[in-house]
Amino acid sequence: MRSFYATIAFFASTMTALQAEQTQPASYCPPRPATAEEQRAIFEQAVQTIIVDQQYTEGVPRHYDEGYIQHDPFLLSGRQNVLDYLANFDPDSVNFTVINKGIDNNRAWIFQRVEQVGSEPLGWVDLWRMNGTCIVEHWGVSMPKPADAINPLPLW
């Protein structure tokens, strides 16, 4: 009898997990309305997948709008251009350390230390505009800490 209840509990937990997976959309784009809490959770998921786990081909199509607007002077707008750019980052030779992040009123930001083999570390800030569930616009600024810096405070 005890194994019967254990089997029922196992199947119930498996069904709950499968339902949770099925309720998560394949993509958050095109944009759909989202509460502030939903938007925060979606942004946290994007940071984890794209920045921390460096799973670009999974994260970018899920979180970036096809008509994504890019303000970086060295990159063109569009989701595919983001994927092409991120393909240059080898996860084995670049490390992104999230220092701070936040989201408020459809604006999200992240401050990170970026270390790439053969280069000095960078302080890197990304700013995004979200439309509901979807990232639709980006600004980014990065800078190395110069060797002759006079400010003793750390960059990151």
Predicted regions, residues:
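C-terminal and inter-domain tail/linker signature
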Residues: 5, 14-156
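Classical eukaryotic N-terminal signal peptides for Sec-dependent ER targeting/secretion
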Residues: 1-8
